[in-house]
């Protein structure tokens, strides 16, 4: 009987020792795996660029987010610059490698190869239909033309400011502008805008709401129109909707990642005459040179000084999104 008890006790002790050994072995294996995993994470982390995700926060006001101005002479290694110019510049220069030359010149000012994009446009009117300013910093060169001075002024007002816009259903509703910052912006191949002011009985003032030929014409066959009417008055609006779209917009403030350089002309455009526009002449400047090579040399030479008057933004102007919210 005692032999059986001794055997049982011995068996129990052996199992206990064996279990203890197994647990220690498992612990050592887990420690080995964990330590090596942590070592792998430490080694790999510096080479991985990942996005941190958090809760969704409500967006209010403008979707543009400004960053602190770059105020030191170090190279702009993480920024992009778009330079927009009329296509006539390419015709005059007539050099297939001129962009490579400019790229090398920008490199001397701290802009790495590949960070500067040169984009041409046909003319101011065409550029007004679909302005797309995608880079961190955007500089638009406008050659002065007395016949398109008003088009240049409206385009400058559009791209140098942030706008919050909503669609307008002019077939069903009357509209009024609530304050000086409230404008109607139209874009398209051909925009003819007519308005009929209404009295408190919704009868036309000097016009018939049922006859568009009696409406007051404020724009004729233009590609970009920023319409300003008397505040607090309802209007019946007529627009060539087949070739033009119209939006009810609110000017939010300056779009500080855009600068406009006027090339030539005896007068410099001054959009600050608009009471809704804060002084921003630093981002509206003029270069008086006849040859485009001289213009580009000047831009390269002063690019960093121009950038100092601007602020980097996370979002830039795209006319498709502009119509709804910027």
UniProtKB/Swiss-Prot annotation:
Highest taxon of the lineage: Viruses
Residues at which Ca(2+) 2 binds: 177, 228-229, 231, 301
GO MF terms held by the record: metal ion binding
One GO cellular component term: host cell endoplasmic reticulum lumen
Predominant cellular place of this UniProt entry's protein: virion
Residue numbers spanned by region GPR motif: 253-255
Segments of this protein annotated with the region CNP motif: 165-167
Pfam families xrefs: VP7 (PF00434)
Additional remark text: Some rotavirus strains are neuraminidase-sensitive and require sialic acid to attach to the cell surface. Some rotavirus strains are integrin-dependent. Some rotavirus strains depend on ganglioside for their entry into the host cell. Hsp70 also seems to be involved in the entry of some strains.
Family from the record: Belongs to the rotavirus VP7 family.
Role summary: Calcium-binding protein that interacts with rotavirus cell receptors once the initial attachment by VP4 has been achieved. Rotavirus attachment and entry into the host cell probably involves multiple sequential contacts between the outer capsid proteins VP4 and VP7, and the cell receptors. Following entry into the host cell, low intracellular or intravesicular Ca(2+) concentration probably causes the calcium-stabilized VP7 trimers to dissociate from the virion. This step is probably necessary for the membrane-disrupting entry step and the release of VP4, which is locked onto the virion by VP7.
Complexes and interactors: Homotrimer; disulfide-linked. 2 Ca(2+) ions bound at each subunit interface in the trimer hold the trimer together. Interacts with the intermediate capsid protein VP6. Interacts with the outer capsid protein VP5*.
HAMAP family, alphabetized: Rota_VP7, Rota_VP7_A
Official protein name in the record: Outer capsid glycoprotein VP7
UniProt source species: Rotavirus A (strain RVA/Human/Indonesia/69M/1980/G8P4[10]) (RV-A)
Source taxonomy: Viruses, Riboviria, Orthornavirae, Duplornaviricota, Resentoviricetes
């Amino acid at each position: 009987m005692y032999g059986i008890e001794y055997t049982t006790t011995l068996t129990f002790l052996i199992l206990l020792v064996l279990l203890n050994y197994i647990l220690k072995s498992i612990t050592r294996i887990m420690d080995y795996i964990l330590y090596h995993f942590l070592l792998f994470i430490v080694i790999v982390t510096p080479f991985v660029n990942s996005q941190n995700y958090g809760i969704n926060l409500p967006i209010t006001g403008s979707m543009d987010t400004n960053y602190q101005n770059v105020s030191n002479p170090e190279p702009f290694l993480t920024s992009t610059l778009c330079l927009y110019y009329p296509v006539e510049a390419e015709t005059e220069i007539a050099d297939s490698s001129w962009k490579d030359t400019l790229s090398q010149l920008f490199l001397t000012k701290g802009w790495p190869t590949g960070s500067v994009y040169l984009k041409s446009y046909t003319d101011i009117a065409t550029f007004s239909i679909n302005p797309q300013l995608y880079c961190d910093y955007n500089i638009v060169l406008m050659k002065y033309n007395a016949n398109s001075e008003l088009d240049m002024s409206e385009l400058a007002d559009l791209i140098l400011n942030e706008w919050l816009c909503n669609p307008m259903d002019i077939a069903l509703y009357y509209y009024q502008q609530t304050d000086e910052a409230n404008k109607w912006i139209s874009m398209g191949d051909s925009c003819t805008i007519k308005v009929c002011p209404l009295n408190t009985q919704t009868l036309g003032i000097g016009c018939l709401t049922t006859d568009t030929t009696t409406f007051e014409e404020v724009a004729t066959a233009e590609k970009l129109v920023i319409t300003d009417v008397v505040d607090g008055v309802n209007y019946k609006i007529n627009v060539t909707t087949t070739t033009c779209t119209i939006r009810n917009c609110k000017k939010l403030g300056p779009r500080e990642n855009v600068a406009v350089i006027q090339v030539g002309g005896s007068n410099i455009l001054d959009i600050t005459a608009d009471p809704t526009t804060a002084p921003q002449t630093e981002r509206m400047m003029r270069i008086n040179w006849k040859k485009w090579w001289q213009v580009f040399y000047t831009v390269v030479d002063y690019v960093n000084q121009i950038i100092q008057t601007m602020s980097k933004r996370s979002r830039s102007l795209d006319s498709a999104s502009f119509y709804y919210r910027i």
